[in-house]
Amino acid sequence: MARIAGVDLPRDKRVEIALTYIYGIGRPTANVILKKTGINPDTRVKDLTEEEVAKLRDEIEKNYKVEGELRREVALNIKRLIEIGCYRGIRHRKGLPVRGQRTRTNARTRKGPRRTVGVKRKK
């Protein structure tokens, strides 16, 4: 089993698809990596030689931020926004959409389940 950047790539999938299991690598990036290393995207992971796996590993480690390093950078960016108190930081802190979406209706993914506010009747 090919292990790159701490992720076990699925053996039966094509290399192009298998690389997307690594956080920070999508289809376009996977294709660029395969083009640079000269590996056919249609090759199955189980058919890769140790040399090809080493090439992929080197290319990804040298030129791309992936997995833990990328997650840490994203978390630090969000933390910085919160600390400086900018609009986006405030939206992150309140758990609201950050990119200008409407919140009067919708935005349920970001806001979580509804908390119904009831009214009290006079007795």
From Swiss-Prot:
SUPFAM superfamilies: S13-like H2TH domain
Top-level taxon: Bacteria
Disordered, as annotated region: 99-123
Keyword Calcium carried by entry: no
Alphabetized InterPro entries for the sequence: Rbsml_uS13_C, Ribosomal_uS13, Ribosomal_uS13-like_H2TH, Ribosomal_uS13_bac-type, Ribosomal_uS13_CS
A GO molecular function held by the record: structural constituent of ribosome
Keyword rRNA-binding set for record: yes
Summary of subunit composition and partner proteins: Part of the 30S ribosomal subunit. Forms a loose heterodimer with protein S19. Forms two bridges to the 50S subunit in the 70S ribosome.
Function: Located at the top of the head of the 30S subunit, it contacts several helices of the 16S rRNA. In the 70S ribosome it contacts the 23S rRNA (bridge B1a) and protein L5 of the 50S subunit (bridge B1b), connecting the 2 subunits; these bridges are implicated in subunit movement. Contacts the tRNAs in the A and P-sites.
Family statement drawn from the similarity comment of this UniProt entry: Belongs to the universal ribosomal protein uS13 family.
Name of the protein described by the UniProt record: Small ribosomal subunit protein uS13
Gene source species: Carboxydothermus hydrogenoformans (strain ATCC BAA-161 / DSM 6008 / Z-2901)
Organism lineage string: Bacteria, Bacillati, Bacillota, Clostridia, Thermoanaerobacterales
Primary gene name: rpsM
